[in-house]
C-alpha cells in the first residue's frame, strides 16, 4: 500500500503539468499596421503592433504588392525603422503608386495575418520638426520692441528644389501658464511676436507640414527672458485712448437721456405743415383729390363731349352803333361787280377760318325734310323814304336784271357766316358764298300764298323796268311798294322775295354775307363781303360807304330768321345803282318758282367756336337740288 502512494502522486503531478502546458500554447494573434510615414516623399516606413504569441516563439513578416500586380514582395529592411517596422528606401519607393501591405505572424501552433493597408506615398508625408530654433529680443528706435523667432527646415526635406513645400506654425507660452499662444507663419522661416509681458520667461516651439500630409512633431522648446524695463508705451497710449473714448460716449448717452427730444428735433427737424390758404389737411389725408383741388381753386379736367354737344344757340352781339348797307347787285350775278368804297373793319376775329368747308359739307349732306314756311309778324314797321339816291352808270352788256334789294336795320354784334356745300347742278364749282339778297331769291312763296301777293312779287322779281329812270327813283318806288306791301300782310302770310334769275347759275365765284350784330329787339345787321370790281367802274359821285341793313322780326321754330325792312334805313345815305338798259326778261327757272319753302337743321351745320354760332345763308338753298 505504501509502495503505490508515490506513484499516484507523480501521476497527479504530471497530469497537472500537462494541463498547464496545453493551456499556454496557441497560434499567434492578429497583428495590426498602425502607421506609415514618409519624411521627405522619397522613402517611407511602416510600423505594426504584434498580436498574442500563443506561448510559442512567433515570426513576423511584411509582404506587399503594388496595385495592378500579382507578384508579392517582402519588406526590404526590418532594421532601419526599428522593431516591428519595415523601411522602404528610394529604390523601393514610387510616388503616385498604391502599395497593398500585409503583416503575417507564425509559430508552431499556427499563423495569422493583419488587415491589408493601402498606402500612397504622396499622402503619408510627415516631415521631421524644424531645426535650429532661435529667439531674439529686439528694440528698434522707431518701432515698439518685439521678439524675433527664426528656424530652419528639416535636414531631410529638399525645399530648395521645390520637391516639397512646407508651412510652419509657432506656439509660445509664459513659463508659469498652461495655455499656448499659436501663430501661423506660412512658408517663412522667421516671425515677430509683439505683445509680450515684461519680466516673463517664454517657451517657444515650431512645427511644419507639407502640402499633402501631416503636421510634424513640435521642435524642442526654446526659452527667453523678457526684461522688466521692456517698453510698453504703445500699449499705454491705446489704453488711454480707449478710456477717453469711453468717457465721451458716457457723456453723450447722458445728454441724450436728459434732452433727447430737443436733440432729435435739432438733428431731424419735423416736416412743416402746409401754409396754403384754404388748404385742408384732412382732405389730403383722406385722398379726395377733387375736393382738395376745388378748395385750392384749381379747375378740374374739362368734360369730354361730341362736337354737336358744344353747339350754342345764340349769336355774338356788341353795342356798336354802325349801320351798313348791302351792296347793289352786279350785272353778272347778284352781289358781284361793284366794289364797296369803304367797309368797317371785320370783327369776325378769325372764327370762320377754324371750320373747314369740308367739315361743314360732311355735316350738311343729310337731306332736309318738312321745310317750314316764313310768316310775317303783325305790326311790321313801315320803312321810311331814303334821303338821297346817287345814280351810277349802267353796264350796257348786262344780261340780267338788277336785283331788287330790301333795306334792313340792325344794331347787334357782327357774326360771320360759313358757306354750306351747294348742289353741283345749281352753281358753278367756282362759286362759294352768297349774300342775303341771294337768300331772298330762294325764299319763294308756295301754292298757299295769296294770289295778290304772288302777282306783286312776280312783278318785282321777273319784270324788267320799263323806263330808264335813275337808280334813286327806282329805289324809292321799290321802297314805297314795299311799305304798302308790309302794311297789307298779316302774320299768316308767306313772304315772297324777288329774284331776277335762276338760283346760283353764275359761273363767277360768289361772296358771303357777314351778320354784323343782333340787338335785343331782334334787329340783324349785315356786312357785305368786300370784293374787287375789275369789270365795272364806280361813279365818281358814289359815297365812300355802302351799307344796307335788315331787321329780324322773329325766329321760327327751326331757327329761321324772318327779315323785314328797316324804317330807319332812309336816314342812312345808301349807294344807288344807275339805271341801265334792261334786256328782255327771260323765264325764271321752274324749279325756283315751285319751291316755296326750305328747311334748316338746327345745330346741324353749326360748329362751336368760342361759344358763337355761324349762320350761312347758303344753307337755305340745300333743298333746291
Curated annotation (Swiss-Prot):
CDD domains: FN3. The keyword Glycoprotein applies. Residues 27-128, 129-229 form the Fibronectin type-III domain. Glycans are attached at residues 59, 104, 132. Disulfide bonds join 36-46, 75-86. It comes from the Eukaryota. GO terms for molecular function: cytokine binding; metal ion binding; peptide hormone binding; prolactin receptor activity. Keywords: Disulfide bond, Glycoprotein, Membrane, Metal-binding, Receptor, Repeat, Signal, Transmembrane, Transmembrane helix, Zinc. A motif (WSXWS motif) lies at residues 215-219. Belongs to the type I cytokine receptor family. Type 1 subfamily. This is Prolactin receptor. It comes from Sus scrofa (Pig).
